[in-house]
Amino acid sequence: MAVSALQLWRMGGLLRRRFPTCLSPWKIPPRVLKSSQPEALVSLTNNAVAFAPLQTLTDEEIMMKQTVKKFAQEHVAPLVSSMDENSKMEKSVIQGLFQQGLMGIEVEAQYGGTEASFFCSVLVIEELAKVDASVALLCDIQNTIINNLFRKHASEEQKATYLPKLVTEKLGSFCLSEAGAGSDSFAMKTRADKSGNYYVLNGSKMWISHAEHAELFLVFANVDPSSGYRGITCFLVDRDTEGFQIGKRENKMGIRASSTCQLTFENVKVPETNILGKIGHGYKYAIGSLNEGRIGIAAQMLGLAQGCFDYTIPYIKERMQFGKRIFDFQGLQHQVAQVATQLEATRLLTYNAARLVEAGRPFIKEASMAKYYASEVAGLTTSKCIEWMGGVGYTKDYPVEKFFRDAKIGTIYEGASNIQLNTIAKHIDAEY
């Protein structure tokens, strides 16, 4: 098994037309916004409390960020266009994520994990999304939802059985949504009826991410529909379980390399030992994991938007029209300044929410704010970048239009934008 870079550190296409030289099809942008680059945390010489800027990172966080950036540029970027076109995640990318230790970021070392921080997960997701949002989502769900559900709610036996595989080779899938239970996720109809030492699952799930490659499915089903959401329980279902079927992948607009499938359960027998946590507590686990997961999606949208912005700015600084750079037109400068400001605000919202999680402080409102705002800014940023690049940005020869397509999902999954606004308003009402 390959050792992650962080663990080692701890131990010791031709252009069809003539365009500015900075523009190269499906390549990593040569320049990035300086203000988006973090600085290492400096040691204070006095006893004062350190109130460091939110973008100030520890040496470990800097190392993680640099490692992921290198991995994304060298191993993901060359495959992004083909994965999008073929709607398929390359196995080499999945294997690379495991080999780099990026699929067990917070998992304890005793289970083979990297044992880093939640904030490190956010940095990893952001860096991957600068290159491909689909790969970032793969890493996001595995870390912020699947692994953390096990870390917080699994029995010691379940942790010992599943976590070592989840951090090295096995993908997990979070199965909550149904055809009639999207934003109202607790209106689910999937049932789990007791039968001896087993529960028998019947029903279906929709819009399930990574179902095509996942080997372990965390399925939420109701053991007592008469109790409403208080009967919802989380079951561990292996891919090869009899009666469990995975449907065809959806032909999506964006994040096409990330599979999304329907699941069907026909008298699927699951042993009692495969219940995650307590019976009837599934709704608590789902809410808790999604609250943290929304910060991951905020990081994905932030990285996606920043990656698109970084790709576009060098072009408009070299593209000449009317005898001068198009960047020199004041109208365009104002648009660029507005987008850059919104990106910075997104980064601060996202980082702040992540730091709140690490500090053990309330973060639900801030997570919703980060997810909502990051999704809106990603849509605006990618749209503007296409406009700034003109016809070039509208073609599939360059990644800007893909960033635009990928961005739209941010306002939909893991809590639509209106749901985030509801959550924010609910907290404001309580605070006043």
From Swiss-Prot:
<feature type="modified residue" description="Phosphoserine">
    <location>
        <position position="183"/>
    </location>
</feature>
<feature type="binding site" description="in other chain">
    <location>
        <begin position="207"/>
        <end position="209"/>
    </location>
    <ligand>
        <name>FAD</name>
    </ligand>
</feature>
<dbReference type="GO" id="GO:0016937">
    <property type="term" value="F:short-chain fatty acyl-CoA dehydrogenase activity"/>
</dbReference>
<comment type="similarity">
    <text>Belongs to the acyl-CoA dehydrogenase family.</text>
</comment>
<keyword id="KW-0443">Lipid metabolism</keyword>
<dbReference type="Pfam" id="PF02770">
    <property type="entry name" value="Acyl-CoA_dh_M"/>
</dbReference>
<feature type="modified residue" description="N6-acetyllysine; alternate">
    <location>
        <position position="284"/>
    </location>
</feature>
<comment type="subunit">
    <text>Homotetramer.</text>
</comment>
<dbReference type="InterPro" id="IPR006091">
    <property type="entry name" value="Acyl-CoA_Oxase/DH_mid-dom"/>
</dbReference>
<keyword id="KW-0597">Phosphoprotein</keyword>
<dbReference type="GO" id="GO:0042802">
    <property type="term" value="F:identical protein binding"/>
</dbReference>
<feature type="modified residue" description="N6-succinyllysine; alternate">
    <location>
        <position position="70"/>
    </location>
</feature>
<protein>
    <recommendedName>
        <fullName>Short/branched chain specific acyl-CoA dehydrogenase, mitochondrial</fullName>
        <ecNumber>1.3.8.5</ecNumber>
    </recommendedName>
</protein>
<feature type="binding site">
    <location>
        <begin position="387"/>
        <end position="391"/>
    </location>
    <ligand>
        <name>FAD</name>
    </ligand>
</feature>
<comment type="function">
    <text>Among the different mitochondrial acyl-CoA dehydrogenases, acts specifically on short and branched chain acyl-CoA derivatives such as (S)-2-methylbutyryl-CoA as well as short straight chain acyl-CoAs such as butyryl-CoA. Plays an important role in the metabolism of L-isoleucine by catalyzing the dehydrogenation of 2-methylbutyryl-CoA, one of the steps of the L-isoleucine catabolic pathway.</text>
</comment>
<feature type="binding site">
    <location>
        <position position="229"/>
    </location>
    <ligand>
        <name>substrate</name>
    </ligand>
</feature>
<feature type="binding site">
    <location>
        <position position="183"/>
    </location>
    <ligand>
        <name>substrate</name>
    </ligand>
</feature>
<dbReference type="InterPro" id="IPR006089">
    <property type="entry name" value="Acyl-CoA_DH_CS"/>
</dbReference>
<keyword id="KW-0285">Flavoprotein</keyword>
<dbReference type="InterPro" id="IPR009100">
    <property type="entry name" value="AcylCoA_DH/oxidase_NM_dom_sf"/>
</dbReference>
<dbReference type="InterPro" id="IPR036250">
    <property type="entry name" value="AcylCo_DH-like_C"/>
</dbReference>
<feature type="transit peptide" description="Mitochondrion">
    <location>
        <begin position="1"/>
        <end position="33"/>
    </location>
</feature>
<dbReference type="InterPro" id="IPR013786">
    <property type="entry name" value="AcylCoA_DH/ox_N"/>
</dbReference>
<feature type="active site" description="Proton acceptor">
    <location>
        <position position="414"/>
    </location>
</feature>
<dbReference type="GO" id="GO:0005739">
    <property type="term" value="C:mitochondrion"/>
</dbReference>
<dbReference type="InterPro" id="IPR037069">
    <property type="entry name" value="AcylCoA_DH/ox_N_sf"/>
</dbReference>
<dbReference type="Pfam" id="PF00441">
    <property type="entry name" value="Acyl-CoA_dh_1"/>
</dbReference>
<dbReference type="GO" id="GO:0050660">
    <property type="term" value="F:flavin adenine dinucleotide binding"/>
</dbReference>
<feature type="modified residue" description="N6-acetyllysine">
    <location>
        <position position="426"/>
    </location>
</feature>
<comment type="pathway">
    <text>Amino-acid degradation; L-isoleucine degradation.</text>
</comment>
<feature type="modified residue" description="N6-succinyllysine">
    <location>
        <position position="278"/>
    </location>
</feature>
<keyword id="KW-0007">Acetylation</keyword>
<dbReference type="GO" id="GO:0006631">
    <property type="term" value="P:fatty acid metabolic process"/>
</dbReference>
<feature type="binding site" description="in other chain">
    <location>
        <begin position="416"/>
        <end position="418"/>
    </location>
    <ligand>
        <name>FAD</name>
    </ligand>
</feature>
<comment type="pathway">
    <text>Lipid metabolism; mitochondrial fatty acid beta-oxidation.</text>
</comment>
<dbReference type="GO" id="GO:0005759">
    <property type="term" value="C:mitochondrial matrix"/>
</dbReference>
<dbReference type="Pfam" id="PF02771">
    <property type="entry name" value="Acyl-CoA_dh_N"/>
</dbReference>
<feature type="binding site">
    <location>
        <position position="319"/>
    </location>
    <ligand>
        <name>FAD</name>
    </ligand>
</feature>
<feature type="binding site" description="in other chain">
    <location>
        <begin position="174"/>
        <end position="183"/>
    </location>
    <ligand>
        <name>FAD</name>
    </ligand>
</feature>
<dbReference type="InterPro" id="IPR009075">
    <property type="entry name" value="AcylCo_DH/oxidase_C"/>
</dbReference>
<feature type="binding site">
    <location>
        <position position="283"/>
    </location>
    <ligand>
        <name>substrate</name>
    </ligand>
</feature>
<keyword id="KW-0809">Transit peptide</keyword>
